[in-house]
Amino acid sequence: MRVCKHVSCAGQNGTPILMDIRRLKSFIVIVDSGSITRAADLLHIAQPALSQQLAALEEHFGHKLLIRSQQGVSMTDAGHAVYRHAQIILRQMEQAQADASAAGNSLAGRVSVGLVPFSSAATLSVDLLAETRKRHPGILLHLTESVGQTYSQMIMNGRLEMALLHGTGPIKGVRFEPILSEEFFLVAHRDFAIEADAKPVSVNTLDGIPLLLPPAYNFVRRAVDTAFTRTRTNLKVVAEVEIVRTLARAVGSGLGATIMPKAIADRIVSESSEPLICRLVSPRIEETLSLCVSDQNPLSEPALAVRDILLELTARLKG
């Protein structure tokens, strides 16, 4: 099937003109790679030709879109706006292609989902993939789990359709749907002389205990920092770890204890070859897990199907 390579949009004077969609793709690659030179290599085109495409885009929109420097390129305010719309346009074109190809058949298309690490969301990835493949084999699921990305920004830019993350907003351009409250648990080796008790362990009793936690920008660390500050308890972080598997091995080896949401605490206990103490923390530390989508761009049919599966899986965690 022949796919149209142009989109119709208004020029600076408001007159509808045709734009080669490849220019939008090229613009996205330039921004994502951070360099026109790298983008030219990735796109397998000459750098002067790519620069001409960028110049044509800037002429069309009547604004400078990128600022070049020795460090690479950065977007202007106009560039941010064009980047966001370019992502949406290309996603809609891809979905139109998938819908046309699957007309009369099952759902098809690409759906991007962000799952925040160190949370129940991170434990759902395999189940989400399995259920999506089982129910909608035509859907290409793109899962990302990263501490270095701002998922809300990626949703606004059209790079993600949805994300499970902590917080309830508000963030302009993103709609938050609270779906789960996560309680935090202490996980420690028996050598730390913490009793295996069903009762919550007081934060005050953890004064000076060596802890393994994520860096300060991580939501887990912020929640723990707040709890220790409020109870005027000395927080002793001996290492900052952002890899759950490494964290599990370190806790199991007695290198330090940790405080994590229940889903991650359970995973650490299950992966350890050593018996570990796992107790709820008091005063209670908890964070709200929300399903986030754009409040401006409606979800595609495939994305709605994936959203339904996500809600089913998180409902199981509550039970």
Residue ranges and their predicted role:
Residues 110-171:
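Central regulatory/effector-binding core of bacterial HTH transcription factors
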Residues 122-123, 201, 210-231, 299-307, ...:
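Secondary-structure junction motif
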Residues 28-46:
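Short helix-boundary/capping micro-motifs
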Residues 58-77:
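A short LG(V/I)-centered, amphipathic sequence patch enriched
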Residues 150-151, 156-160, 165-166, 217-277:
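Hydrophobic hinge/microswitch elements
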Residues 174-211:
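Flexible hinge/capping segments at coil-to-helix
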Residues 276-319:
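A late-sequence structural motif
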